[in-house]
UniProtKB/Swiss-Prot annotation:
Protein name stated in the entry: Protein MGF 110-11L
A Pfam family this chain is assigned to: v110
Principal location listed in the UniProt entry: host cell
Role of this protein: Plays a role in virus cell tropism, and may be required for efficient virus replication in macrophages.
Membrane topology value: Multi-pass membrane protein
Keywords, ordered alphabetically: Glycoprotein, Host membrane, Membrane, Transmembrane, Transmembrane helix
Record keyword Protein biosynthesis present: no
Keyword Nucleotide-binding: no
Glycosylation positions in this chain: 97, 294
Family classification: Belongs to the asfivirus MGF 110 family.
Gene Ontology CC annotation, any one: host cell membrane
Amino acid sequence: MYFYKKYLHFFFVVSKFKFFLKMQVPFGCNMKGLGVLLGLFSLILAQQLPDLPRTQHPPKRELKYWCTYVPQCDFCWDCQNGICKNKIMETQLIDSNHSIVNCRVSRNSETQTCFYEISSKMPNHFSMSCSHPTPYIGNEIFMKKVGGDYMTLLTLKQYCLYFIISIAFAGCFVYAVRKNLRLNTTIKLLTLLSILVYLAQPVLNRPLSIFYTKQFLPRTYTPPTRELDYWCTYAKHCDFCWECRKGICKNKVLDDMPPFIIQNDYINKCSIARYFDRCMYFIEPKIPYIHYMNCSLPTYYG
């Protein structure tokens, strides 16, 4: 329901935008209207996703699914009889086989921190910073885990691109003022530039969606063998995970897959991407056969 409201709000703004284009008003008022439109667009982009809910005491039959939710904070607990073992990272301040009574994990979207309770007697909470998995860009040389210099390089690339975009927008505005262009022509120029900026998002490894600007969900390609667990952790954002061995991809999360693909079907590319609320993976030899699956956040345990 949350995302449906955002879509309805977006289409309402678009309809008002089309109506505004047909109006012929003085140039001074046009600039005010343009400012209002840009403000509405910024408001849409600034909308926050809802906080990720707390998970607590998953039943044994749901352990895989609960563990699927936890990797959004880059760690995953395999909980059996009160013993939680970290399946992703070994170099933590807490022992991998430490007894965690409650196995409780929560995420605060404002502070970007995760908490899990070590003992029910003292409540001792350990805070861990959350970060999104480093994207794979298709070349094994550039594949690094979180903590390397890749994110810094990506941030610099973003700043450079945004600086160029700012200059382009300012240039369009100055050109429109000097030439005394009508509002219709001015907005067409800015709209064209906005479309170009929107299509340039894959350069920054970001999804083509204004509703997921707060998430870093880049495209993943075939990972090296040593990175399979980490790549599989990222793929679980779409509620399925492929264990790829020599081109054979086995689904580790869901057994009741649609009839379009068999659990042990041969998938040559083993690539997963997320656009809007869908994931896709490529199947051989039916090129370019693409099967779409709806994405959703795992159900939490209250």
